[in-house]
């Protein structure tokens, strides 16, 4: 039944006489499906096959373009550019279907957060594992201000997720890892502009949206966590305990059964193995999706933590996809995201300010990841990582054609609508190859056939309209059918290309190992496509050729003459060995002169 849960008349009061151009409106029905991510194209095709149905049409949602009521929304130029507003339209907000999910936790691992800010408090992550009084919250509004819930401040590490009762005592809304000993439980910040960086980041991650206050965030209704990483006695222009903060955010989210998206809007030069391994552990052991700012220097260089493996590195673009020559660019950058004139929350007076920096670009992108997770709750870290990068718009390279930045701004500028609506890519592995050849080895001049076995990993999407092709760097290799469509590969299934790839090795190729790439492409939709490649090595042996011995029986006789004549008359197509063995005068042409030489060889003249 394809998850159909309701069928109703499209126009309930349409009568038999309500007919126009052959369309009888009283006989049109609307079908509802449980899953809003169903493959509607295939469902439509299935319905059209039913004899009782004449026509099937999509019913597109028609509603006013959703604009949240946050008074500073019109100052947020980037919301429209990255199409967050279009992405929100997938939800029926007016009917109470709200984007976001409170179990999705976006962490500002930074200088700390003014978590009492009126645009943050309603989306504040509250650690209910520490809710000692059981009232369902860990903050209270008392005497005109928000405070940590006194009923939960019992001096006990209630959730004790690290099996150490003396560590994270009463971490009700996050943690200050820079405090004394294990830190302290209040990641609040001084009420001045020097310490506003983490608050500004938090607002971009998940400011409460549609609350008649301040700004909007793409994540809309996800939680925001504060992790303070610099002590108030230190210079707020530095992050002193950033990786400790990263680990807290990752583990706190993991053990609270939430989904952690961690933003690191800080960094610098210099690779550190310990930092890399910390990042990898947080990603693979604690399921944290990590974003980091690529840097604000107009140079091409690696920047850490953004250049570490398992981190989504984000550089900054300006309005209209502009590149204004102030942000870092590098081959390790994954995405570009708006980072100029970005308005968000600050500490002073619970106010707002417009800033620029990759520190802003990174949480703008991370907020999209929160929306993606709320749309696709089954997607995990590597899947969201893959899809947010794959769906970015490469228009930034068209707008900014300067050679020095090509390929250095990531896959493109983030696109919230594409990120939440594009079907999950497959994850393809090459599990086996078979080579069909005339001999036990591949010889110089041979022609072979290649068959591959490809497997699509479980929990990923279907490989749709896939193609494979073989590319080789050697000029002495000819691929007869270099691009080949193959059948779709469903998740957790394998596919064999029963029509083999035909490969000719020239007589001039050097013996030894030569490497080619099997390239796989699928799920192409305009600039979005899944691509992966697999190296395949061919070991080519030097051919031991006896000129004139076309049938390789180690003797030269009349049978070899017959084969040569048939080649000249095009009765047979020679293989690589026959091509060389029949060309007795080595002029690369097989003709009557070769027949004469062959006969003379037989007659021993």
Language-model regions, residue ranges each:
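Autoinhibitory propeptides
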Residues: 8-76
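Subtilisin-like serine protease catalytic core
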Residues: 86-239, 257-260, 271, 307-310, ...
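Extracellular S/T/G-rich loop segment that most often corresponds to the catalytic His/Ser-adjacent loop
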Residues: 110, 303-374, 378, 412-414
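The feature captures the short pre-catalytic strand/loop hairpin that immediately precedes
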Residues: 170-188, 337-364, 395-402
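C-terminal subdomain of the subtilisin-like protease fold in secreted/lumenal serine endopeptidases
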Residues: 226, 241-247, 255-266, 272-278, ...
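Intrinsically disordered, low-complexity Pro/Gly/Ser/Thr-rich segments with frequent PxxP/GP/PP motifs
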Residues: 478-508
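Terminal connector regions
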Residues: 502-542
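Cellulosome-associated attachment modules in secreted, modular CAZymes
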Residues: 512, 536-605
